[in-house]
Amino acid sequence: MTKKLPSELKQTRKSIQTACEFCHTKHIQCDVGRPCQNCLKRNIGKFCRDKKRKSRKRIEKHGTQPYLNLGKRLVIHDVPSKTVSPSSVHLQRDFLSSDQEKPGKTPAHNTNIQYTYNINDNFQSAGSIPRITNFNTNNGQTVLENTSNNISASQAVHLMNDPIIPTVRKSTLNLKSHFLEQHKAMQQPLATNCLVATSNVPVHSGMDDSNKSDDDVDDETNIHFDSMWCNDEYMKLKDIVDISTPFLPNNSQIFSLQESEYPNPSASTRGNSSLHLTNLLNSTKSVNDQKDSSIGHSTSTFNTYDEVVSRPFISLDMLHLNRGANANTHPSHNAKLESECDSSSHSDADLEKHDTDFISPSKFRELVKTPQDLYDNKCLIKPHNYKLAYTKLLTTLRKKFLEGAEIDKSASVKDEHSTQKHNLRYDLEVIIRSILERYAPIFISLTSNMIEEDLLLQEVTLQRALLDLENMAKLVSCTPMCIWRRSGEICFVSNEFYSLTGFNKNLLLDRTSFIFEYLDHKSVSNYFQIFNELLAFGYNDINKRKKLLMLNACSSTSSKITEGFSFTTDGKAIFTKCNLLLSNGLYLKCACCWTVKRDSFNIPILVMGQFLPIFEMD
């Protein structure tokens, strides 16, 4: 049984309201004296002082009185384009002096508080914050609806896009119903003098009612989830899909323009497909330029915004090449072909000016011969400029598919030579669509969070893997081998490949050369469709992927995928056939194996091609 304590000891062990800092830290019983007995025993009496507690944040449960003499300023950054980032809206509030100050404190002066909130967060605690209930991007205007009854139209809200956070298109921004549901739950009055007038674009008073009806229909077609995390994830996925195909028109525009330009159905289905795509892109750009001019923005402002918002290191900006040259002109088809040939001839010189940091594979191999040399000369390695590489690739494909392909309108449709040129133009359109529709969305989703250091690490990984593959090529000396990047730039060519094709080593490795320059048109079209669909990022179901690939194959005879290809179980190699260009201008039929090498992000960095000639017996 516990011994009963005397009354004096009970008094000393009685809990006190505030302990000293030492007793609070050591979790021992303190007394009311200062210094206390515990500190005196340890000779630290001069440091004995009360433990300061954190002040409680008292939140009123039954609503708050509206602040008096409260001025606010809602600042949202200016958007030169038609998109607004919903995941981050910067608010800047200027709190003036209020009558409801805490006792013991002097009235506070003007305090500038800047913070960031998510539009999906709960607005229950922010009783006086003006809420944005609609994002309207019709005709380049951003209309902000404030739920407050008192609106100050003389003050402006500045809209500017945050370059760090990716923009989201109109379909992901219309969360009107979501905000209205939250507005019904709020029972708190909103502050007056809210600034909601937009200043980035002139607000036209005579806005058509049709625009409002279109916005209402678009709001009803949106998908809303009960969870704000699901909404955020859905918006990110829509962002990936929308940004992956900029300036790419829909099918209705394609077919309508195609029927208008080609009344003959036999000529419109296959012929002039590349011209049709070029005209469509130019017309789309001209419409955008007209919209920009109507709302007071110049083309230079649009291009400046493009440079700020676009990713500086990762880009598939293939359709933006020469988009400003033919935006406002509508020449004939022959004049367009001549302009394309002239632009392609001058584009090489322009690209070389921007390629000052380029080091040819042969010169780089003279500096780096072993893995130790790679890490010793790591300062020489820079992230590869894939944007410039894809621009050069598009120029190479244009030369290969459109060189000398002038169309004679008086020629017969049944002419075999004319039909072949039409098919080549259609194949080029299929290749571009394959990149934009199949490869680009997955690639952007995998690289959306990469930074410059990741790209530098990716380049080091590529060079390290290239050294291993070159050593393997020396061991397997009987197979002609060629290694290229995901953009098609050749990095290594074995001696057997030189012997098979007859080309000089300096011709391939002393400049930027693409593997597609040494394949025929059919092999190039097959490669892009197989690589973008199966080889680039792998596949789960082989049979399902193969059936899907065969269904997506075009009806053109020159671009139809051959059925003679097979897969490996790991999804890293494909066996097929191709026609390899020789130095004498002829093509040699070969059985080839394309093996992909991916990095830790599952992004393809290298493709190794092995070629074995097929000699047909008469």
Curated annotation (Swiss-Prot):
Q: Where is this region: Disordered?
A: 325-352
Q: Which Pfam families match?
A: PAS_13, Zn_clus
GO BP terms, alphabetized:
cellular response to starvation
Q: What is the protein's name according to its record?
A: Glucose starvation modulator protein 1
Point out the gene that encodes the protein.
Answer: GSM1
Q: Give residue spans, biased composition: Basic and acidic residues.
A: 335-352
Name the source organism. Saccharomyces cerevisiae (strain RM11-1a)
Q: Where are the transmembrane segments?
A: none
**A Gene Ontology molecular function term of the record:** RNA polymerase II transcription regulatory region sequence-specific DNA binding
Family, as annotated: Belongs to the ERT1/acuK family.
Q: What does this protein do?
A: Transcription factor which regulates nonfermentable carbon utilization. Binds specifically to 5'-CGGN(8)CGG-3' and 5'-CGGN(9)CGG-3' sequences in the promoter region.
Which residue ranges does the Swiss-Prot or TrEMBL entry mark as DNA-binding? 20-48
Location of this chain's protein in the cell: Nucleus
Residue span, PAS domain: 466-538
Q: InterPro entries under this entry?
A: ERT1_acuK_gluconeogen_tf, PAS_13, Zn2-C6_fun-type_DNA-bd_sf, Zn2Cys6_DnaBD
Report the GO terms under cellular component: nucleus
Task: Note the SMART domains from the entry.
Answer: GAL4
Keywords (alphabetical) are: DNA-binding, Metal-binding, Nucleus, Transcription, Transcription regulation, Zinc
